[in-house]
Amino acid sequence: MKRVFLIVLDSFGIGEMPDAAAYGDINVNTLGSVSKSPFFHMENMKNMGLFNIDGVEVGEKTDHPTAAYTRMTERSRGKDTTIGHWEIAGIYSPKPLPTYPDGFPEDVLEEFRIRTGRDVLCNKPYSGTQVIADYGDEHVRTGKLIVYTSADSVFQIAAHEDVVPVEQLYDYCRIARQILQGEHGVGRVIARPFIGESGHYTRTPRRHDFSLLPPAVTMLDQLKAAGKDVIAVGKIQDIFVGRGITEHVYTSGNAEGIERTLEYLDKDFEGLCFINLVDYDMLYGHRRDVDGYAKALAYFDEKLPEIQAHMKPEDILMITADHGCDPAYTATTGHTREYTPFLMYGAPVTPGNRGTRPTFSDIGATVLDYFGIQPEFEGSSVLKADPS
């Protein structure tokens, strides 16, 4: 029974792409920055071949890699979660999703006010924790919604759970999602509930993403159409708006995501288990916390042998990322335009170097190839590529 476990280490870039400067990113390298932390330890991924990947100049190379290893190029125009995951699944995005460094236009906000019956606060790029510190009191006093964005293509709505019940906040996000289409089709509308008293507001785990519907067929659609199981762990369900997915489970962070992965390794199914581990990006990358990022990578690396021990003879483990988020890059707090790693491990895989690939979509093509499915998108399998 063939199974693929595809794990996305959210934001784990391995060095700037040639066009990074066009995205405002100069000398960015998530792996390079994190490797300088005293908490950096990736012995198991080293054994797989992480430091043997083209262009990786940190860490110790291994003479006997246990996995196939590849440097992946993002072909799409962008560096965000949505576009990165879409490309992994086969969608090329020739234009970046819209961003709003000066806030959202008045016509968008006016329609939002009319349809929700609530006014808005802020309307500018802001740190998620700082925005509730700065606007939380006024929100609690007036009931106005805190609307803000970031360097990414997002429309975020923060509201205190005692002022706006979470389900109502989700309804407001659905309204925003309906409004934000076409020219203003942001990648994600995000609910950001919070609790607490003045001066001590904290965000709750009940965040929810309302993504743009994928504009073309994906690897997930093809697997589901072929009768395979497509299991989503973490925010994969939201990124693809449930399309092409047969079962999903949300997680509260990396530790739970890894535990859910171990549980699915022990279940019987045929198809794909697609996992997103978000803490690298959400807790450490954007917050520019090098040591926190390093510790989170070390934790995953420590769990790798357990994951591998639960694999069956026809299982393939794939590890990659969707973009970079260099925690040492201080010009912005946003994502960084980087190459990503791709490690492929299991009995059906011949270890070795697969070079540098021209698109993340080669990952989707590789998954489909393993199940004998011809991709309905541009992408080439590296499953049978000659290792060098």
What spans do the regions from the language model cover?
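Feature captures the catalytic ectodomains and active-site-proximal regions of enzymes
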Residues: 1-388
